[in-house]
UniProtKB/Swiss-Prot annotation:
Residues passing through the membrane, by range: 21-41, 44-64, 85-105
Name of the protein in question: Transmembrane protein 18
Keyword Transmembrane: yes
One annotated Gene Ontology cellular component of this protein: nuclear membrane
Ranges of the Nuclear topological domain: 42-43, 106
Record membrane topology: Multi-pass membrane protein
Subcellular location: Nucleus membrane
UniProt keyword Lipoprotein, yes or no: no
Molecular function per GO: DNA binding
Membrane side Perinuclear space: residue ranges: 1-20, 65-84
Family: Belongs to the TMEM18 family.
Coiled coil: 112-136
Region (DNA-binding): 106
Organism per entry: Xenopus laevis (African clawed frog)
C-alpha cells in the first residue's frame, strides 16, 4: 500500500513556481498579517483597523483577481488567475480569513471573560446585600 503524500510533496508537485518574487512577497505579507494579528491582541483600536482592512481586502479579491489576470505578464512567469478565482481564494483570501477568524475567536473569548467577571461581581454584590440585611 502506497504512503499518502505529505503537504510538502503536494506543494512541490503543484504547477506553481514558489520561487517567484511576487509569491514570496505574498507569503511575507501573510506572515506580517499573522504577526500584526498577534500584536493587535494588546491594542483594541489596532485590532479593529487590522480586522476591517483584512475584510476589505477579502471583499476586493474578485477585483484583484481580474486585474491580476489582465496584467500577469508584468510580474509572473505563468497565469495563475483564472475566472473561477480558485488561486486567489486559496493563496490570498484564505490566510486573511484565518486571521479574521482568530480575531473573532479572541473577541468571543474576551466577551465571555467580561461576562463571567460581571456575573461574579453581581453575585458578590448580592451576597453583601444579604449580609447587611441579616445584620439589621
Amino acid at each position: 500500500m502506497a504512503e499518502e503524500p505529505g503537504v510538502w510533496s503536494l506543494l512541490e508537485r503543484a504547477p506553481i513556481d514558489w520561487t517567484e518574487p511576487w509569491l514570496i512577497g505574498l507569503a511575507a505579507f501573510h506572515i506580517l498579517c499573522f504577526i500584526v494579528t498577534y500584536i493587535s491582541f494588546k491594542s483594541y483600536p489596532l485590532q479593529i483597523c487590522h480586522f476591517l482592512l483584512m475584510v476589505v481586502l477579502v471583499s476586493c479579491a474578485e477585483y484583484i483577481n481580474e486585474f491580476a489576470a489582465m496584467h500577469w505578464r508584468a510580474y509572473s512567469k505563468q497565469q495563475y488567475f483564472d475566472s473561477s478565482g480558485m488561486f486567489i481564494s486559496l493563496a490570498f483570501s484564505a490566510p486573511l480569513l484565518c486571521n479574521t477568524i482568530i480575531i473573532v475567536v479572541h473577541w468571543v473569548y474576551k466577551t465571555l471573560c467580561v461576562m463571567t467577571e460581571l456575573k461574579t461581581l453581581q453575585q458578590k454584590r448580592k451576597e453583601s446585600r444579604e449580609k447587611r440585611k441579616k445584620k439589621e
